[in-house]
């Protein structure tokens, strides 16, 4: 038996889950927020208890020390030596990493170099990896890449219709993201349907603050909505999703607050989407409250959101030449029945029909009617478990 920590580190946060492996039992989980800011918050959940501390945590190394000390302090482990592996979620692996890998100095350097593809994510992941390697140098660290699952896309799918020199010289192409989530829910969908994954055509919709849709053919990603960066695709919580690229120079010319392309991209990443259009929030619960109040901006934001998701799902029916099931996952995908209802309502031509009661009352599993030609599934994603499994598989290979 061994204990494995799955880590999802952001620029100012560190989310974690401790597993007993190979039993896949969750022993504890938590998050450290506001790293590098005043009044950082460390939350630990274990044995039905919740412990919260407000501290000043200056960097990721300090955050990791606090996490490990908390595990001992709360009696979750007796010593650091009980931990036999650490797995790290890394958003961008580019073309370098087609599967999960054991971390070494070269791998860490390459992850930092790939930050250009995920500037909001890779630097935080690298900081988390470095912190664990400094504090637990003898423990195997494994990187699990969001992009790895999408390396099965064909060249005509991942290349953009621009001169090929930009791919050859600068590796500009579609990489995708959320691959670990899409892989996991596809595997779970096959179990739920009682059919081999290798026989299924699935559309998986990861709808959280970030949104990505993937076309899965016989267990492999053949297309996905996120692109060169996670900014592409349908509308998201704070991200615009796809826009006409000519808007970028136009806004620089017109708006004195936007001085260069970086300013515009920052606006598209952090101040757009549901939040930017509604002026209320990036949280679908707040948007739905606005719908109840007939707030016109909330209504507009919601309608754009539904429209963009329907269009993306529809195009993947064409890519796959039909589908056996549509899978909803992640925060909104799992917990926003109105959103699911309105998305499916616009796709009824494809033969989808959902059971209203199962949809509304938080049912996990098949929410479609018996007559539905395409099954509609709600599956809770578990990226942390996928990470822990890869650590278990790779920890003796370094």
From Swiss-Prot:
Leader sequence segment: none
Residues annotated as binding Mg(2+): 8, 383
Xref: InterPro entries: Ac/propionate_kinase, Aliphatic_acid_kin_short-chain, Aliphatic_acid_kinase_CS, ATPase_NBD
GO molecular-function terms, A-Z: acetate kinase activity; ATP binding; magnesium ion binding
Gene Ontology BP terms: acetate metabolic process; acetyl-CoA biosynthetic process
Swiss-Prot/TrEMBL catalytic activity: acetate + ATP = acetyl phosphate + ADP
Catalytic residues as annotated in Swiss-Prot or TrEMBL: 146
Site (Transition state stabilizer) residue list: 178, 239
Localization (cell): Cytoplasm
GO cellular component: cytoplasm
PROSITE patterns in the cross-refs: ACETATE_KINASE_1 (PS01075), ACETATE_KINASE_2 (PS01076)
Pathway annotation from the record: Metabolic intermediate biosynthesis; acetyl-CoA biosynthesis; acetyl-CoA from acetate: step 1/2
One matching Pfam family: Acetate_kinase
Cofactor(s) required, per the database record: Mg(2+); Mn(2+)
EC number(s) on file: 2.7.2.1
Binding site for ATP: 15, 206-210, 283-285, 331-335
Cofactor: how bound: Mg(2+). Can also accept Mn(2+).
Gene3D superfamilies documented for this protein: 3.30.420.40
UniProt KW keywords: ATP-binding, Cytoplasm, Kinase, Magnesium, Metal-binding, Nucleotide-binding, Transferase
Cited function: Catalyzes the formation of acetyl phosphate from acetate and ATP. Can also catalyze the reverse reaction.
HAMAP family: Acetate_kinase (MF_00020)
Subunit description: Homodimer.
Protein family: Belongs to the acetokinase family.
UniProt protein name: Acetate kinase
């Amino acid at each position: 038996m061994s204990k494995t920590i799955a880590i999802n580190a952001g620029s100012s946060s560190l989310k974690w889950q401790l597993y007993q492996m190979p039993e896949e039992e969750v022993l504890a989980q938590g998050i450290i927020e506001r790293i590098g800011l005043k009044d950082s918050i460390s939350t630990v959940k274990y044995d039905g208890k919740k412990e919260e501390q407000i501290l000043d945590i200056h960097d990721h190394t300090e955050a990791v020390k606090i996490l490990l000390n908390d595990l001992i302090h709360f009696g979750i482990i007796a010593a650091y030596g009980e931990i036999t592996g650490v797995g790290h979620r890394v958003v961008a692996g580019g073309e370098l990493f087609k599967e999960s890998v054991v971390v070494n100095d070269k791998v860490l350097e390459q992850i930092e170099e790939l930050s250009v593809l995920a500037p909001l994510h890779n630097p935080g992941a690298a900081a988390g990896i470095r912190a664990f390697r400094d504090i637990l140098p003898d423990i195997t660290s494994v990187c699990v890449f969001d992009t790895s699952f999408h390396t099965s896309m064909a060249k005509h799918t991942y290349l953009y219709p621009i001169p090929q020199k930009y791919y050859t010289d600068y590796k500009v192409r579609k990489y995708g993201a959320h691959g670990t989530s899409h892989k996991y829910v596809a595997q779970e969908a096959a179990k739920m349907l009682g059919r081999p994954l290798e026989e299924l055509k699935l559309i998986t919709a990861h709808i959280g603050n970030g949104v990505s849709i993937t076309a899965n053919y016989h267990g492999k990603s053949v297309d996905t909505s996120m692109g060169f960066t996670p900014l592409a695709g349908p509308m998201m919580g704070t991200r615009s999703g796809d826009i006409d690229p000519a808007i970028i120079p136009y806004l620089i010319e017109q708006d004195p607050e936007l001085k260069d392309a970086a300013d515009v991209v920052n606006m598209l990443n952090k101040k757009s989407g549901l939040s930017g259009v509604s002026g209320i929030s990036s949280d679908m619960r707040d948007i739905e409250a606005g719908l109840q109040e007939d707030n016109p901006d909330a209504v507009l934001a919601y309608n754009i959101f539904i429209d963009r998701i329907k269009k993306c799902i529809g195009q993947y029916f064409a890519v796959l030449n039909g589908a056996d099931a549509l899978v909803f996952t992640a925060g909104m995908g799992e917990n926003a029945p109105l959103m699911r209802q309105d998305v499916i309502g616009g796709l009824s031509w494809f033969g989808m029909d959902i059971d209203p009661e199962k949809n509304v009352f938080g049912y996990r599993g098949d929410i479609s009617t018996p007559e539905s030609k395409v099954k509609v599934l709600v599956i809770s994603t578990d990226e942390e478990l996928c990470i822990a499994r890869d650590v278990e598989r790779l920890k003796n290979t370094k």
